[in-house]
Regions:
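N-terminal secretory signal peptides and thylakoid transit peptides that target proteins
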Residues: 1-17
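A glycine-rich dinucleotide-binding beta-alpha-beta segment and adjacent secondary-structure elements
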Residues: 74, 307, 498-581
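Core beta-strand elements of the Rossmann-like FAD/NAD(P) dinucleotide-binding domain
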Residues: 151-153, 327-336
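Conserved redox-cofactor binding core of oxidoreductases
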Residues: 240-328, 347-350, 398, 510-529
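Glycine-rich loop(s) and the adjacent beta-strand/alpha-helix scaffold that form part
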Residues: 332-398, 594-597
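An anion/pyrophosphate-binding glycine-rich loop and adjacent beta-alpha core
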Residues: 375-379, 383-494
């Protein structure tokens, strides 16, 4: 559909012909300009456009009116994050059309996208001659609980991220009645915000490429990468279950993987699969669709877990929760409860309680929902917390917002080198995250930079997949482009003469096939010829290694090491698996392995 000026309109049959276009959905097929639809329009309808600035740039909507009503809303242009911003837009569009009001709350977890969408719709409503100010005074519309929700179930799962979906779907596939609670207005947790990479030893790409790997080798990498603090038994469960979890995602979840792998820091070999779309949304959206098709699984958004319920023997037999949109309270009765609500990276007070260095000056990549609520809730009934002082920072993050920078994956694609303001390399680019983060802190201004060129960028799909991110970084001065090294250094004040020497030295190492300075462990690719790019970055809190102490059956343990009957935990919610530091792509493996373990064992109790 071509763009319209905001005061032009289409009438009658032309709009009726749009009836078959794709309905809006937070996990609908991805694309910059999609047709987002809520409601239906008939003869006499008119179309009005409105525009606002969202998180990913300009957002344009088309509001279809019939008389004084909004018949539906089409999204003409959007670069909001797939499965996150788009999910918030989905919720608001549905509320607006069904309830004929603009008096709606922003969707938690997608606030910026929600605000932009509402502003654009308001703009279009004003263009139609109606007054958005009047629409905003109408009766408030709020999301409702799923139809047919019951509080007497077999299994309650808290947290609709990767671990939560794995647990809930596994229990539901075993024939149990399951409810999955999510306190935000969107699902996905940190999994949907991630790149979705999953470490899997002995996968078919390794066999195709002649890469020797084993469960034991991956387990050793994880244990060494965590300084031998993680529980080897828990690590072995993750590594042994990785291949099966990958197959489950394919055959039960419909997840598709790209035909290549990525090397992550701290691993001894390349073993990490990348989902279609290069994002965790390529996993979560498939699992959410699978959940929608199961009658015995209800996903409750805007529903916060408040209190675990125990019987006289101490067994967990239910959970109290509140719908934050409607104010309704629930007293769920269940045979088992699974906590999969992630870590506490977004809770500065809690971070500082366990590690005073992780103060408010350090931003976070994490979901706004990663606040440790369930850590506290479980601790109140005697659950043991372990390794809480170990908090990981991700090295290549936005210096202004703290968001993880996917352009920074040029490092993981072996197409960039890390430099400082003096123009020198200061760390091996494929080192552990904590090693790189600590090295960045020692550099001038606590900021690192990476340099790559157009040829390197063209060898990846990073520019295509992350176009909106790159545009934003250019606009805010965190990414620069220049025909020469001297030109690209200028915006950052980097020593161009020294960087020229550094790049020439690197290119020589690539020719020789060895890096005597830092022992680079992956493929050595030269940076020869412009245009050149430089990206500025700094570390942000990314993952909390500590959490509820569990055993290999995902049962939560008390301070004496005994299982608390009926209580399970999985994913970042559970600690003592990663040790002092997590290797990249092992979290996705963990959430789906232990999510399935928790789901299966909880189902066995029901």
């Amino acid at each position: 559909m071509s763009n319209l000026s905001r005061r032009n309109f289409i009438t009658g049959g032309a709009i009726a012909a749009l009836g078959g276009t794709l309905a809006i959905a937070g996990c609908a097929p991805k694309g910059e300009s999609s047709s987002t639809v809520a409601g239906a329009a008939g003869e006499g309808a008119q179309a009005w456009t409105g525009t606002a600035n969202g998180k990913g740039g300009e957002l344009t909507v088309e509001v279809i009116t019939e008389g004084d009503s909004i018949a539906r809303i089409n999204l003409l242009k959007s670069r909001e994050s797939y499965g996150v911003g788009t999910a918030g837009i989905d919720v608001l569009s549905d509320l607006i059309v069904k309830n004929q009001t603009l008096n709606v709350d922003m969707v938690t977890g997608a606030t910026v996208s929600s605000m932009a969408f509402l502003a654009a719709v308001s703009d279009a409503v004003d263009a139609s001659g109606m007054k958005s100010s009047e629409w905003k005074k109408r009766e408030k519309a709020v999301p409702q609980a799923p139809e047919g929700l019951t509080t007497d179930v077999d299994v309650v799962v808290v947290g609709a991220g990767g671990a939560g979906y794995a647990a809930a779907l596994t229990a539901a596939e075993a024939g149990k009645n399951v409810v999955l609670l999510e306190k935000l207005g969107i699902v996905g947790g940190d999994t949907i915000l991630s790149g979705g990479a999953m470490a899997v030893p002995n996968n078919w790409f390794q066999k195709r490429d002649g890469i020797e790997d084993s469960v034991e080798k991956m387990a050793e990498d994880m244990i060494v990468g965590g300084d031998h603090v993680g529980d080897p038994d828990l690590v072995n469960v993750i590594c042994e279950g990785a291949y099966g979890a990958m197959e489950w995602l394919i055959f039960n979840g419909g997840v598709a993987w790209q035909p290549h792998e990525r090397f992550f820091g701290g691993h001894s070999v390349i073993r990490s699969l990348i989902p279609e779309g290069n994002e965790g949304s390529g996993i979560i959206c498939k699992l959410d669709k699978r959940a929608e098709g199961l009658k015995n699984l209800k996903v409750c958004r805007n529903t916060k877990a408040d209190e675990l319920v125990q019987d006289a023997s101490g067994a967990v037999v239910g959970l109290k929760a509140t719908n934050t949109a409607t104010g309704e309270t629930y007293d769920f009765k269940a045979k088992a409860v699974i906590l999969a609500a992630g870590g506490f990276g977004s809770n500065v007070e809690m971070r500082m309680r366990y590690n005073p260095e992780m103060d408010e000056k350090i931003l976070s990549t994490d979901s706004v929902g990663a606040t440790g609520d369930c850590h506290v809730m479980a601790e109140k009934i005697g659950a043991n917390l372990i390794d809480m002082q170990y908090i990981q920072t991700y090295p290549t993050c936005d210096t202004q917002t703290g968001a993880l920078l996917y352009v920074g994956n040029m490092r993981l694609e072996n197409r960039a080198i890390c430099i400082n303001k003096e123009g020198d390399r200061f760390v091996e680019e494929m080192e552990r995250r904590d090693v790189i983060s600590n090295a960045i802190k020692e550099q001038t201004d606590g900021i690192g930079y990476m340099i790559f060129n157009q040829d390197g960028l063209d060898h990846t799909d990073i520019a295509t997949v992350n176009a909106a991110e790159m545009d934003g970084l250019f606009g805010r001065g965190q990414l620069a482009k220049g025909e020469t090294i001297a030109e690209v250094c200028e915006p950052f004040g980097i020593d161009a003469a020294e960087l020229q020497k550094t790049v020439e030295k690197w290119n020589g190492y690539c020719k020789d096939g060895a890096d005597p300075d830092f022992n680079y462990r992956a493929a050595l690719n030269p940076i020869e010829g412009g245009p050149y790019y430089i990206l500025a970055y700094k570390p942000s809190v990314h993952y909390t290694m500590g959490g509820l102490h569990i055993n290999t059956d995902a049962q939560v343990l008390d301070s004496d090491g005994a299982p608390i009957p009926g209580l399970f935990a999985a994913g970042e919610q559970a600690g003592h698996k990663m040790g002092t530091n997590r290797l990249g792509s092992c979290s996705i493996t963990d959430v789906f392995v232990f999510g399935r373990v928790a789901g299966a064992n909880a189902a066995a109790l029901a």
